Amino acid sequence: MCIRDSTCELSMQIGRAAAMVLTENLSHRPKVMIGMDTRASSEMLEASIAAGLCSVGADVLLLGVVPTPAVAFLVKEYGYDAGVMISASHNPCEYNGIKIFQSTGYKLPDELENEIESIILDDAKVPPVMIGGDVGRITRSDTAADDYIKHVLSTIDVRCENLKIAIDCANGSSSVSAKRIFESLGADCIIINAC
């Protein structure tokens, strides 16, 4: 879902609806991770999606700024029920988007996406906000980017010694990983437009 003029209200509704769908399909409290890119609206959307998820009882792990493939990998690696990536990929910076991954690291099936959309469009389906111990908890990961970088490096069987590489991170989420990955492979890196 790509959103122009993203709002806290809409992203909170997405979080609530996603938590409701997960709760209906699981026998335990849902665990959802959230990663984001570096767009100006990403932190705002992260907070409102997390609030929506927690308000319907899901526990949330905030990954911080990570590339989209990191969420797809880490949701499976950490054993989470779903992963959310806040990013509009190649779209202009005033846009933002929300991608939801299932526990396998693949996108949610269309039927679950349609169910989430149906709940958002029919607010009567959304359960009341939980209170007390039923409210989900939010924690932050200090190791998400490191865990993803270790995984990427474990899949690459190439060395880059004697290479000088220029990387334009375009002020995006690869800013947290590109230099570390290429330098670990032996490259001499020149990085521009890194956050």
Regions picked out by a protein language model, each given a short descriptive name:
Residues S6-E9, V66, S118:
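Short alpha-helical interface patches
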Residues A19, L26-T104:
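Ferredoxin-reductase
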Residues N96-C195:
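Gly/Ser/Thr-enriched, mixed-charge loops and adjacent short helices
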Residues I14, T68-V71, G79, Y106-L108, ...:
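Residues in flexible loops and secondary-structure boundaries
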Residues C8, S42-E43, P69, D110, ...:
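Loop/helix-junction capping segments adjacent to catalytic residues or to phosphate/diphosphate-binding pockets
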Residues R4-A51, S55-V56, D134-K164:
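An N-terminal, well-structured beta->alpha segment
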